Amino acid sequence: MNNIELLDCTIRDGGYVNNWKFTDEQMKKCYNACSIAGLDYMEFGFRNIKKKESIDKYGPSYFSDEEYINNIVGNQESTCKIAVMVTINDFDINDFVPKNQSKISLVRVLMAYHGGKNKDDLVLDIKQLSDGIVQMNQLIELGYDVAFNIGRIDKVSFEQISEVAKLLSQTKIKYFVMADTYGSVDNDYIEKLIPFVKREFSNSQIKIGFHAHDNCTNATTKALHALKYGADIVDGCVLGFGRGSGNAKTELLMMDLNKNYNKNYNFINIIEFGDEYLINYKECTNNLCYNVVYALAAYVGCHVTYAIDIIEIYDKMKVSDIYNIFMELKRLNKHMFHYSSLFKELYVKLKHN
């Protein structure tokens, strides 16, 4: 179970929110947070063809060229590998240098509509897929690991999945990733889908992945359920920050994987990045809005009133300080009930350090 991997796609998926106009500082902070956290991959963005109309409209992580990535990463050494995404048959293989000249490890090739240009769910566009495999093989020859990401997985029949598996099993791609594009996949379907896909790819070394959307506020649960039923890698975004309803929350995935899969992710830096650059916990003051302070309280096992006080009464605190106070309450065995005077004492002590 310790072979499970986690990919953070905050920048690539969250780019739909701001047209990929992240500052260099945000990018560097995100990569640093992912590195310290021990994440397996950070997806820097798309690698799209540079067209004038696109350059005018979108920020640099829409293109994620070599110069841009090199500028963000610099000489930083990290076990967190870099990924980019391309759209099947809609990218230029010449935009990729050999892997030994690039900081990119993984290229994810997206086929959003299995029916091709007609977008007909009853049809599997074999030509689109076959042409895409040619380019995937070219990427592999350049030295990259390759993931094939298929969208709208609930619209792809099991028979079509079998056809896709037969073609992809003949390649050396590393991952087959399914996207819950409309957020409509539920856990019952996951229990059927993941084992079926595992069987279809059983004669290959290809790992299975799942990308969940949060339309029904259950993306994190679905991602974890996919892991329970055999997925090898799942995607997440910091605080769920992504297109539309968002995605599975990277920090919650990390917490669960630490508890149940013997992982040792450092999620504090991830949360601090989100708190500083996406939305801080003081802006989420009612229970209709996800607030990560409650997640931290749950992870440690602290009484909810401590979290409420932090959000509603006390001045803004660093996420690491919140976590340390929770851990100190637990050490003192005062975490399960609300001791307001003790909490105030710990808070004042923290402020004066």
Predicted regions and their residues:
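Catalytic cores and adjacent flexible loops of soluble metabolic enzymes
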Residues: 1-353
